[in-house]
């Protein structure tokens, strides 16, 4: 049987007023019990977005483009004092990047915070974040990819619902913009994610009892395991979820709906990271359901020496006997739907849709 490889979607690869700096407050390192959930206030046109780089730096051109994108959404933009600082592949030292986050949460004139990009380095700054202060100054925090480490930290340590969504360097096309607004600005009681409006995306097809890679139709997601489940949405980038496993910032997946995306990792690496989350009884084996995004550019270069991505996903996840879908449009793809981290939702894998059960912002 002929197997097609995944066809990679393209990922999207001004001035502002500085504000007074605050010294970063180092975490006491205590493993906090799960804090009571806090849902931040919605964003509105005219609000001020704080733009920062908690991982890899932005170039001046990327910064200008990011500011323009946010202004086109109707926001005012203020970027962090350390925005254009570089330290190798990082956007400044760990303490500088943490300081930017702490002071943006503390600044009452900042209504929401968006990351300029991902890259690498978010996990390094977790010990320097003041989670008590952040909890007392809740506001939307938005990002994905390497920013998964911060989504874990904010939700687990401060109880703050945050948002796996586009960043400054993202492509604000119709779908990305629509779901950003539906989640963060114009919340609905039961927002449905089902790819109905999506142009062709990557998917998986079932043929002769096995999974085969295909181009999906505009309405297609793939059911790996049918069924329905409810739970809080948590998740993010698989590499970061794996990195955080066993740390004080890790999250229990018991009865959660776990969403996962990845980019540029070979099938054996996907296998290894999923296996790590399977070997812990409080991780994927305890989950209520799994929502997989598009695993962009994750097929083997030489498929004769490798399992396909499809085979890995089927082998590792089908045996859990919980609902699993593949292909929801989020992650390292152009049409990147915003997912609220910590909001209750219902997964209907048989019908290939995800529905929020509460408003994602207050």
Walk through the language-model features, giving the residues of each:
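C-terminal segment of N-terminal export signals and the immediately downstream linker at the start
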Residues: 21-58
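N-terminal small/polar loop signature for handling phosphorylated ligands or for N-terminal nucleophile
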Residues: 82-138
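Conserved anion/nucleotide-ligand pocket segment
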Residues: 167-235
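Oxyanion-binding "anion nests"
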Residues: 233-271
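N-terminal export signals
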Residues: 5-27
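C-terminal active-site/capping subdomain that shapes the small-molecule cofactor and substrate pocket
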Residues: 269-362
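Short, acidic/small-residue loops that bind anionic groups at enzyme active sites
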Residues: 131-153, 161-168
């Amino acid at each position: 049987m002929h197997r097609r490889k995944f066809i990679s979607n393209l990922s999207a690869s001004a001035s502002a007023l500085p504000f007074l700096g605050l010294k970063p407050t180092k975490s006491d390192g205590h493993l906090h019990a799960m804090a009571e959930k806090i849902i931040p206030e919605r964003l509105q046109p005219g609000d001020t977005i704080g733009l920062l780089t908690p991982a890899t730096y932005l170039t001046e051109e990327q910064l200008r483009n990011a500011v323009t994108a946010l202004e086109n959404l109707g926001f005012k933009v203020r970027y962090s004092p350390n925005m254009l600082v570089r330290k190798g592949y990082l956007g400044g030292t760990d303490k500088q990047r943490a300081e930017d986050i702490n002071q943006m949460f503390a600044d009452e004139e900042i209504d929401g915070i968006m990351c300029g990009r991902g890259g690498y380095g978010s996990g390094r700054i977790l010990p320097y974040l003041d989670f008590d202060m952040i909890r007392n100054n809740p506001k939307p925090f938005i990002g994905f990819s390497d920013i998964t480490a911060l989504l874990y930290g904010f939700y687990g340590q401060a109880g703050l619902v945050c948002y796996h969504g586009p960043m400054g360097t993202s492509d604000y096309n119709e779908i990305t913009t629509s779901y950003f607004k539906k989640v963060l600005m114009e919340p609905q009681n039961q927002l449905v994610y089902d790819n109905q409006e999506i142009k062709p995306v990557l998917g998986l097809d079932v043929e002769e009892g096995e999974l085969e890679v295909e181009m999906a139709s505009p309405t297609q997601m793939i059911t790996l395991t049918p069924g329905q489940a409810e739970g809080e949405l948590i998740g993010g980038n698989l590499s970061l979820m794996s990195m955080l496993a066993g740390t004080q910032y890790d999250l229990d997946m018991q009865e959660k709906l776990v969403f996962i995306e990845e980019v540029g990792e070979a099938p054996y690496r996907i296998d290894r990271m999923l296996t790590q989350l399977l070997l812990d009884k409080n991780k994927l084996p305890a989950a209520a359901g799994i929502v997989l995004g598009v695993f962009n550019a994750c097929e083997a270069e030489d498929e004769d020496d490798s399992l396909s991505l499809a085979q890995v996903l089927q082998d590792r996840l089908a045996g859990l006997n919980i609902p699993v879908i593949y292909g929801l449009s989020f992650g390292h793809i152009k049409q990147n739907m915003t997912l609220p981290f910590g909001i209750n939702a219902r997964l209907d894998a048989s019908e290939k849709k995800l529905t929020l059960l509460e408003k994602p912002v207050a």
